[in-house]
Amino acid sequence: MSVDKKWVIFDLDGTLANIETRRKIAKKPDGKMDWEIFFADKLIEHDEPNEPVIKMAQALKASGYNIAILSGRSKSSKQVTAEWLKKHGVEYNILKMRPTSHPWKFMPDEELKLGWFNDLFAGDENRDEHEVVCVFDDRQKVVDMWREIGLTCMQVAPGDF
């Protein structure tokens, strides 16, 4: 199989982007997360790059692999997200972000990403020629899902949330 049919999937928050500062700012006094603050564009644009993971994405892209970024982040942040990825030198073929409409808005990340994965090559008459080589993610539930469907998943950080 030629490398042009090979894909690597990356998560965004906690994987390509270090979100610790944003997480601290958005944490309420009771310890719960204020998701409106957490996903505010003005905070997203200041995320620090997770350099080792970004270097992997760059090396894989330079070697001819296709890059798909599947993020639970809202589609309403697509512009600031695309600008952040460009600023940090992350090239990609596909960027999927959570739709703002129901039922997608509240769907667990592992269900959302499995749905996207199942539709990734839909409509391509050569669908069976594509291969997902591996996945980079941080969230345990999502990592477990990738592994359950038989994909190799590189867990880049602890993600029990």
Task: Kindly label every feature range from the protein language model.
Residues 57-61, 118-121, 147:
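Surface-exposed amphipathic alpha-helices with a cationic face
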Residues 4, 113-140:
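Conserved Lys-Pro-Asp/Glu-containing loop-to-beta segment of HAD-superfamily phosphomonoesterases
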Residues 130-161:
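Acidic, Mg2+-coordinating phosphoryl-transfer loop and its flanking beta/alpha structural elements
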Residues 81-89, 120, 144-150:
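Short, aromatic/basic amphipathic alpha-helical patches
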Residues 95-98, 127, 161:
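Short, surface-exposed, polar/charged, turn-prone segments marking secondary-structure boundaries
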Residues 2-103:
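Alpha-helical substrate-recognition element adjacent to the catalytic core
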Residues 106-111:
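Alpha-helical scaffold elements lining the catalytic groove of polysaccharide deacetylases
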